[in-house]
A protein has these predicted regions:
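Loop/turn elements at helix/coil->beta-strand transitions in domains of secreted/extracellular proteins
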Residues: 222, 254-259, 298-299, 316-322, ...
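Von Willebrand factor
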Residues: 23-38, 53-55, 68, 77, 287-319, 362-365, ...
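Bacterial N-terminal signal peptides that target proteins for export
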Residues: 1-12
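Sec-exported extracytoplasmic/periplasmic mature domains
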Residues: 232, 247-255, 290-294, 308-316, ...
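DG-centered beta-turn motif at the end of beta-strands
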Residues: 228-231, 242, 261, 307, ...
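Acidic, polar loop-rich interaction surfaces within structured domains
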Residues: 181-183, 316, 338-354, 360-473
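C-terminal motif of bacterial Sec signal peptides marking the signal peptidase cleavage site
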Residues: 19-21
Length: 569
């Protein structure tokens, strides 16, 4: 409860208002033509009717969504139903709900809600400190990005988005925030700060850790092992999306790459073993995709085990070794423990075999795949359309398959009067041993976003130090790159990437707040929060002139409209 209320208190209108005010000041335009205080950016404030990555609600990818059943939409929900769980926090997915159907009941409203003001008045500046604080930060793998696609998929279906499925750091991974490329084998560390104003004295601090540029000419040969779920639960849309992923991968392979394929349900079959591809769209790989059929139960543990056995056996010097697990995550035969299944991924990293987890399907078990890929330090994506399959495995092929640097951990040293208020990464601690480092892909950046509080006595000259520690994947040498700066220098510096990062955080945290308010405060409060977030997202989309922000605006517009129609008197 406390975490939820703190989250509600931390997100306010001041965040994007401060963003726009700063952008306006930087451009020399302090007022809008309409006197609203927002800069006149010359754009229609309404969302674009379509976008390259948006969803056409009338016929979105029908070939890959054949069994999108209407019984999960708003109209069919029982308004008197009650969910089985209490407050949906970050651990709600462990409450025994193996599929999203467990969330289809309207959330129970908790009548006894503590005063949010108690949290707002909490003094983060106490106790007084005299020494700098050193914090250790970790994001998830830079290509773990399932959460925003799952949220998009639920919104397109007309469903609620449970707060337990929102991992804000995956939203920061999914949407493009780019910095200058470093030289190969190094990282570019970019801290940026924005004063959010208000009596709380909050500032936003965003740290980008950018990997090097990867091109077709510089990528390593690939030894790819596919672990394909063909169990009965994959029937219909999940299987079609699995085929779409295999076809997308075939489009990105080249001569010199090899492919092994393990298909599994309650039995296991080696369909290809170290097959040398002939080039893009290899006929054998495409034929295998077309031949996939579903049936039987789901022994995910056995399928992953055999895939890793083949990956180890087929390792070649100088190649990149990847296992791609494609499944709806519904293990129901053999070993079903998350940790036991994930041991294959965890152990195989010692062999430099890296995991990509790909989720598909209407009953997708998000908790299982997230655990498996976390323990295996692998990327984690969700595929809701064939277009998303191509986005991930054609457009972002190098980022999803290659490794720029390994075991990235950020060390942040703050002055005593600048306190951490809210961290939007995966792990944070004053003890480096409690923070699990993760891998960074090329053509990609890890984003560490946080809100800080300026306490009395903070001086503009107070120093801030950011160090990114990491391992070279070729030499295994431990390296670090550091930036030494000050509060004043950060507040005066460039922050275009931070503007977008703030907007993404408002969107992700807003989705959490809407669901939690339905639980704690009821329909009207949730609708008001949805409308507030929509307003901030619309402002960001107008100011940033960014296609991805337009896509987010379309999603929030749809979500708030569905929320309003669902709870009309």
């Amino acid at each position: 409860m406390g975490r939820t209320l703190a989250r509600l208190a931390c997100l306010g209108v001041a965040v994007l208002a401060a963003v726009v005010a700063c952008m306006s000041a930087e451009s020399g335009d302090s007022t809008a033509a309409d006197g609203s205080g927002w800069p006149d950016v010359g754009r229609d404030s309404s969302a674009d009717a379509s976008s390259e990555t948006g969803w056409d609600r009338s016929g979105a990818d029908a070939d890959a969504d054949a069994d999108a059943d209407a019984d999960s939409h708003w109209e069919s929900w029982d308004p008197d139903a009650r969910s089985d769980s209490s407050a949906p926090d970050d651990g709600a997915a462990d409450s025994g709900a193996d599929t999203w159907e467990a969330y289809e009941a309207s959330p129970e409203v908790v009548e006894d809600v503590p005063d949010v003001g108690d949290t707002v008045l909490m003094d983060v500046c106490a106790p007084i400190r005299t020494e700098p604080q050193v914090l250790y930060l970790s994001a998830d793998d830079s290509n773990s990005q399932a959460s925003p696609v799952i949220a998009r998929w639920l919104i397109h279906r007309g469903d609620l988005v449970p707060s337990s499925l929102i991992r804000t750091y995956e939203f920061l991974n999914y949407y493009d925030i780019h910095y200058d490329y470093p030289e190969r084998g190094r990282v570019n560390v970019v801290p940026q700060m924005l004063d959010l104003g208000g009596v709380e004295g909050r500032v936003a601090l965003q740290i980008g850790v950018q990997g090097h540029e990867q091109t077709e000419e510089t990528r390593r040969r690939l030894s790819l092992t596919l672990s394909l779920d063909t169990s009965g639960s994959m029937g219909g849309s999940p299987l079609e999306l699995e085929k779409a992923v295999v076809r997308a991968l075939a489009s990105s392979l080249r001569t010199g790459d090899t492919v092994s394929v393990v298909t599994w349900n309650d039995t296991r079959t080696i369909a290809l073993d170290s097959y040398p591809v002939t080039g893009r769209d290899d006929a054998t790989v495409l034929a295998l995709a077309d031949s996939l059929v579903s049936g039987g139960t789901t022994n995910l543990d056995a399928g992953l085990e055999l895939a890793y056995e083949r990956a180890v056996a087929n390792r070649r010097p100088g190649t990149l070794n990847r296992v791609v697990l494609i499944s709806d995550g519904q293990a129901n035969t053999g070993v079903t423990s998350d940790e036991l299944i994930a041991r294959h991924a965890e152990d195989a990293e010692g062999e430099e075999i890296y995991l990509v987890g790909v989720g598909t399907g209407n009953g997708y078990d998000d908790r299982l795949m997230d655990t498996v890929t976390d323990l295996g330090k692998g990327a984690y994506v969700f595929i809701d359309t064939s277009a998303e399959a191509r986005r991930q495995f054609v457009d972002h092929f190098y980022a999803n398959m290659e490794i720029a640097v390994m075991d990235v951990r950020v060390e942040l040293t703050l002055p005593p009067q600048l306190r951490m208020q809210e961290f939007h990464g995966e792990e944070i601690s004053t003890d480096p041993t409690e923070v699990d480092p993760q891998h960074l892909a090329p053509n990609d950046a890890m984003i560490f976003h946080q809100y800080l509080t300026r306490c009395p006595g903070l001086a503009d000259a107070d120093p801030i130090r950011v160090v990114a520690e990491y391992t070279d994947p070729q030499t295994h040498a431990r390296r670090s790159d550091a930036v030494d700066t000050s509060v004043a220098l950060l507040l005066e510096g460039s922050r275009m990437q931070l503007y977008k990062g703030n907007a993404i955080v408002v969107y992700a945290e807003g989705l959490k707040n809407v669901y939690d308010l339905l639980v704690y405060a009821g329909d009207a409060a949730a609708q008001a929060e949805c409308d507030r977030v929509l307003g901030e997202v619309r402002t960001a989309a107008d100011v940033l002139e960014d296609q991805e922000m337009d896509d987010i605006l379309l999603l929030m517009t749809s979500y708030c409209a569905d929320l309003g129609s669902r709870y009309e008197p």
